[in-house]
Structures are given as C-alpha cells and as structure tokens.
Swiss-Prot record:
UniProt-listed GO biological process terms: L-histidine biosynthetic process
Physiological role: IGPS catalyzes the conversion of PRFAR and glutamine to IGP, AICAR and glutamate. The HisF subunit catalyzes the cyclization activity that produces IGP and AICAR from PRFAR using the ammonia provided by the HisH subunit.
Pathway named in the protein's UniProt entry: Amino-acid biosynthesis; L-histidine biosynthesis; L-histidine from 5-phospho-alpha-D-ribose 1-diphosphate: step 5/9
Protein name, UniProt field: Imidazole glycerol phosphate synthase subunit HisF
SUPFAM superfamilies: Ribulose-phoshate binding barrel
InterPro entries: Aldolase_TIM, His_biosynth, HisF, IGPS_HisA/HisF, RibuloseP-bd_barrel
Assigned protein family: Belongs to the HisA/HisF family.
Enzyme Commission number: 4.3.2.10
Subcellular location per the Swiss-Prot or TrEMBL entry: Cytoplasm
Active-site residues from the entry: D11, D130
Length: 257
C-alpha cells in the first residue's frame, strides 16, 4: 500500500508566506526558505507553494524563490500560480519544482491540462480545485481567482463534474481545497471528500480544515484520501509533522517515517 502523504502548504504573496481564513484576511507568517527547510527536516513528504495572487494579477510565479527552495530541500515540491502555458510550466520545472499545479488557468482554458500532461507527463500535473459549499442551493461550486478577495467568483462548474472533467483531460492528481473549512481548524469535510473520491481515480489530496491530529486520521480512514494538506497548524506549530506521523502509525495508517 502506498504511504499516505503529509503536505504542508505555503501560500506565497509578495515573496512571503501568508495565511488567511476562508481565503480572506491574510497575515504574514514569514520567509519562504526557512519554513520550507523546517518542514523538510520535520518529515514532510512534499511541499506545495501557492503564489496566491499570480493568477488574479495576470503574472506567473516569481521563479527566484523556486530556485532557492530547490537548493535547500530534498523532498518533492509543487508550485502553483498563474501558470497559463507549457512555457510557464517548463520554467518552473527547470528551476527545480517537481510538479506544477494549475487552478484558475485550467478553468479559463481546460485544454491547458491536456497540453501540460502531454508535454511533461501526468505525474507532474496537479489540478487544484477551490470548492465552496453553498448552503442555499445545497451544491458544491467551483470558485476561481480565490487568492484575491476582490475578484474571487463562482464558476459554472459543480465540483463533482469538474473533478471528472479534469481527469479526462489528463490531471495526474487533484487537490481539493474546501473553502468553507479553510483555516477554521475544525476538520476536513469528510462528506465532500467521499463525494469526490467516488469519481476520482487519481491521487486525491484533502485541503482545508485540519486542526488536530485526529483530523488527518479521519481523512485517511473515512475518505481514503492519498494525502492531507494543511497550513496553519504547521505554521503556528500546533502540530509537529514527526509527531503527527507517529500518531498516524499508531492508528494503523501507513506513513513514511
């Protein structure tokens, strides 16, 4: 059985790591490179970096910090932010990233997923999906440009349909960002994860809501996700990754120690 992955997520804005709650009111956490080093040393399996305003600003990730991160860590990392073409992706991979993740650009141009998968292989193409539960309609809706509070908006896609669409087009992995849970630390949305898992045949990463070690165990045991991504609990040192892995192992969950 493949080991379950623990993935710290670093939201980057203006060259620094920031963290919001439900995608709003971001505070500065610190510099990118020391945080990346700390997580690698603690035992993270992978890191994800989101340049959260690149898409809404119409630019690509600042590649200088990608190269700096690649120099100091020896675990795989994925970079997202404003990647609109194979050239954009190639540059980020050349600077040392192992995977690229696309979100808003894939919604604007779904063919981009196929182009990137054909050129670089599905294993390094991740699609991020920002999913919002609308209590009034009872539906899970995909949102776009979520890094910018002024520009964020609902798309015409329901989450389950978009999950199926991106797989058809060549997504090698899906990160499901559950917006209602983001930064709230009261657990992953297990119901939503199960709904997506039913139609997701590629690795599925849960994102949004981790607040305690039990929340990670729940996502693995109750929704069979392949990885769990979290930010604030790691940034604020609420949870140590090494201790989390020991806990998961005690719960009978396969992890890399």
């Amino acid at each position: 059985m493949l080991a379950k992955r623990i993935i710290p997520c670093l939201d980057v804005r203006d060259g620094q790591v920031v963290k919001g709650v439900q995608f709003r009111n971001h505070e500065i956490i610190g510099d990118i490179v020391p945080l990346a080093q700390r997580y690698a040393e603690e035992g993270a399996d992978e890191l994800v970096f989101y340049d959260i305003t690149a898409s809404s600003d119409g630019r690509v990730v600042d590649k200088s910090w990608v190269a700096r991160v690649a120099e100091v860590i020896d675990i795989p990392f994925c970079v997202a932010g404003g990647i609109k073409s194979a050239e954009d992706a190639a540059r980020i991979l050349e600077f040392g990233a192992d995977k690229v993740s696309i979100n808003s650009p894939a919604l604007a141009n779904p063919q981009l997923i196929t182009d990137l998968a054909d050129k670089f292989g599905v294993q390094c193409i991740v699609v991020g999906i920002d999913s919002y539960y609308d209590k009034e309609t009872g539906k899970y809706q995909v949102y776009q440009f979520t890094g910018d509070e002024e520009r964020t908006k609902a798309t015409q896609w329901e989450t389950r349909d978009w999950v199926q669409e991106v797989q058809k087009r060549g997504a090698g992995e899906i990160v499901l960002n559950m917006m209602n849970q983001d930064g709230v630390r009261n657990g992953y949305d297990i119901k939503q994860l199960n709904m997506v898992r039913e139609v997701c045949n590629v690795p599925l990463i849960a994102s949004g809501g981790a607040g305690a070690m039990e929340h990670f165990a729940e996502a693995y045991q109750k929704a069979n996700v392949d990885g769990a991504l979290a930010a604030s609990v790691f940034h604020k040192q609420v949870i140590n990754i090494g201790e989390l892995k020991q806990y998961l192992k005690q719960q009978g969950i396969e992890v890399r120690l």
